[in-house]
Amino acid sequence: MQAITFSRPATFALLLAVLAGCATPQTRMPTVDSAAMQEETRKQREMVVEDYMNSYRRLQAVASRIVTSGTELCADKMGPYYGLTAWSREDFGKEWHDIVQSRFGVSDVASISSVAPGSAADQAGVKAGDVVLSVNGWTPPAGKDAVDKLMEKLVQEGKFGMPLELIVRRGAEEVRISMMPGQACDFRVRLSPDDVKNAYADGQNIVIYKGMMDFFRTDEEVALVVSHELAHNAMKHIDAKKTNAMVGGLVGLLLDVAAAAGGVNTNGDFMRLGSNMGAGVYSVAFEQEADYVGLYFMANAGYKIDDAASFWRRMATTNSRAITMKSSHPTTPERFIAIETTVEEIRQKLGSGQPLKPELKNAGSAVAREEVQAIPH
């Protein structure tokens, strides 16, 4: 039997004929003007940027209280602090450059993005939107590294404990500002624009995702997660994870060498396996410690800690596996009980007037026992 074949033009024509017979809307709808559509698109994009900026400022205001009140828990990881942050249009994707500059005045020169209430910058009169022209006679560069260079300069000058002389452009005028630095835990707090419920610490930074900011219902919840990640950094968990990974890798390397001596080429498989296993050692304990120390950071900043366990319970409902998974995080029931115990411990210390410091295995250092890595939540 001869196979039936269809030419492409004939098939396309048949498809169009079938589609033409499909049901259509029954009302006469308004036509959409292309110019109006472009304007609406721009408005919505402006709203996206504004929402990000508001989340950023909220995050920085909460974080400022925590890093300035928790200096005793940061041991040797403290630095000068002014209570200001900066951004330039390079901190936004290229597709947003036009909007952030034309609508919000953020150019390729660093400008002040937030000023923490009560901070040195706030008391000196620094305002969000100020464009930084000079720092003790030094002119900040423009472009990709504008913000990093500015923040590095502020830290460098602050280490001398001398007044910081700023010249900023505010509107059409130049304003001179003088201020002295305070002290804070020396970790930068950043907001990732990604729309996921996540946060992590990397030993130098605390990164909160925009999706997590949208998930927070109260500033106490913001403080809880920031404090948890700060605890990872303060307890040097990232360094500990790296050390454990190195030890595991060395053990694996010895196995690779032994296998090679027996005529087996493992291609370094044991070293990689050992490194991964080493990095995972104490991961659950490190998370528990970050919960524990983090609540002390939070309480020292004056935030209410009563609902801490309830927040992690709500987080668990978005990831049901977390209720039983214990590979790198404590299970939710276990976490809830441990957090409630810590909350009661802190309540008792507050009631008796004791210092709000974690109970350490070794009382030698301010807060430095075992140490771990940034683990997303």
Where are the regions a protein language model picked out?
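PDZ-domain C-terminal substructure recognizer with occasional recognition of PDZ-binding tails
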Residues: 149-190
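Short pre-active-site segment immediately N-terminal to the catalytic Zn-binding motif
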Residues: 120, 207-224, 280
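Short helix/loop segments within enzyme catalytic domains
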Residues: 26-80, 169-172, 263-324, 328
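Extracytoplasmic and endomembrane cell-envelope/extracellular-matrix remodeling and assembly machinery
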Residues: 291, 304-306, 310-377
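C-terminal motif of bacterial Sec signal peptides marking the signal peptidase cleavage site
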Residues: 18-21
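PDZ/PDZ-like peptide-tail recognition elements
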Residues: 53-110, 178-180, 186, 190-191, ...
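Catalytic Zn2+-binding segment of zinc metalloproteases
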Residues: 212, 217-221, 230-246, 303
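Conserved PDZ fold ligand-binding element
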Residues: 121-146
